[in-house]
Design a protein with these regions (language model features):
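Non-heme di-metal
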Residues: 1-173
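Positively charged, low-complexity/disordered segments
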Residues: 176-186
Length: 186
């Protein structure tokens, strides 16, 4: 039988991070709506994609919990939904804290308490969170430099709906055939 997490600091860390990931999922869903309303289709899609990834992280953390009531003390962002730029800045800061501080610390505690699989989970999720931060910071830069819809040099753009691809420096405002929005094609 596997060692129990009941009553350990690891159990509290699992619940704390589960709550944080669950809340991040919901914030990113709200942020996606704002981005879509502001015309940032690609950013909205990335917020939605990241929200789904945060759900998966929360699921991985939740599966290690063994039931019952666990008391935790934690701080979480409280409720402001701003512009897309402000939301990206908040999201990047939260991701940075997770990958650089929270999850490495939680992994160390899990190792100390004899839970190497949980420690590995935290280290792996930290890698994903770092990628989330980097992606958000790239979008921040694009908004701040007015390069969301225009790039230097030729860029391959793809319609987000029908997949039609073309090359030029500026985004078409709507798709050639289906009238949907475009984003850089990677």
């Amino acid at each position: 039988m596997a060692k129990s997490v009941k009553g350990t600091r690891t159990e509290k860390n699992l619940l704390t991070s589960f709550a944080g990931e669950s809340q991040a999922r919901m914030r990113y869903t709200y942020f996606a709506s704002v981005a879509k309303k502001e015309g940032y289709e690609q950013i909205a899609a990335i917020f939605t994609e990241t929200a789904d990834q945060e759900k998966e992280h929360a699921k991985r953390m939740f599966k290690w919990l063994e039931g019952g009531m666990v008391e935790i003390t934690a701080s979480y962002p409280a409720g402001v939904i701003g512009t897309t730029l402000e939301n990206l800045q908040e999201a990047a800061a939260g991701e940075h804290e997770e990958w650089s501080l929270d999850y490495p610390g939680f992994a160390d505690v899990a190792d100390e308490e004899g839970f190497p699989e949980i420690a590995l989970m935290y280290r792996n999720i930290a890698i994903a969170e770092k990628g989330h931060e980097e992606r958000y910071r790239a979008f921040i830069k694009n908004i701040e430099t007015a390069s969301v819809f225009a790039k230097e040099g030729e860029v391959v753009w793809q319609c987000r709906n029908c997949g039609f691809i073309y090359t030029r420096s500026e985004e078409r405002r709507v798709g050639k055939e289906c009238r949907s929005r475009w984003s850089p094609y990677h």
